[in-house]
């Protein structure tokens, strides 16, 4: 599937559908080939019923711009992006710093199993 993006904007943004016990939400993550895993904000994960304060989740140590942090690992029922769908998909629950143009990242954990083409001349991204 081919999805258009704005090649002048700098970030490759596209729609992604997330499902959890409380419902479905369409988000707009940034494609991040430097991110090992997909990261979603805790607010978004709460919205679809996949994250709750006070519950202990497995964590992973993640290197961020401000150092190494322990990030909860949370399972979403379904993540669909760029025409591909993964069920029972583990993501990182972490709110990115304010001021960024996005609060979610689609990382290598999702795209690694596919062929990825990002064409900045035409403004299309393909995941097959």
Predicted regions and their residues:
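Pepsin/retropepsin-fold aspartyl endopeptidases
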Residues: 1-128
